[in-house]
Curated annotation (Swiss-Prot):
It catalyses: 3-dehydroquinate = 3-dehydroshikimate + H2O. This is 3-dehydroquinate dehydratase. InterPro entries: DHquinase_II, DHquinase_II_CS, DHquinase_II_sf. Keywords: Amino-acid biosynthesis, Aromatic amino acid biosynthesis, Lyase. Homododecamer. It comes from Clostridium botulinum (strain Loch Maree / Type A3). One of its GO terms (molecular function) is 3-dehydroquinate dehydratase activity. The keyword DNA repair does not apply. Transmembrane segments: none annotated. GO terms for biological process: amino acid biosynthetic process; aromatic amino acid family biosynthetic process; chorismate biosynthetic process; quinate catabolic process. PROSITE patterns: DEHYDROQUINASE_II (PS01029). Pfam families: DHquinase_II.
Length: 147
């Protein structure tokens, strides 16, 4: 069985309330349910983690290598400046795919750069919750995980 960890960063617990014109009305819990439902027939365990605290995200990334085959991460605002999260991502030997709900390249100038992308296999941006599904599909179909 493959084990994938989905990490969500700061303020994503506010989805459904925060800036619905950008993020829509879907909640993080709804996103997690849609992901689980999409992969219900796969031999796959998906765990979800969300924190507004950088240190907790770093700890979870570092610990993930013991339990998971891959990570899907939405670092949210931390993607634009957290060298600490970048370093944690670089320190592990499992694949990481970065996801953003909105198209960061259509946003404010300071949101157009993702420092964490440097440690990601790829970045999926602008497809809403479906970006998480795309990331997991990529991991399952293109990487030799759990073998």
């Amino acid at each position: 069985m493959n084990n994938i960890l989905v990490i969500n960063g700061p303020n994503l617990n506010l989805l459904g309330k925060r800036e619905p014109d950008i993020y829509g009305n879907i909640t993080l819990e709804n996103i997690n349910q849609k992901i689980k439902l999409h992969f219900k027939n796969e031999d796959l365990r998906i765990d979800f983690f969300q924190s507004n605290e950088e240190g907790k995200i770093i700890d979870r990334i570092i610990e993930s290598e013991k339990k998971y085959n891959a990570i899907v991460i939405n670092p949210a605002a931390y993607s634009h400046y957290s060298i600490a999260i970048l370093d944690a991502m670089r320190s592990i030997n499992i694949p990481v795919v970065e996801v953003h709900l909105s198209n960061i390249y259509k946003r404010e100038e300071y949101r157009k750069k993702s420092v964490t992308a440097e440690a990601s296999l790829g970045v999926i941006s602008g497809f809403g919750y479906y970006g998480y599904i795309m990331a997991i599909e990529f991991i399952l179909n293109n990487l030799s995980i759990g073998k």
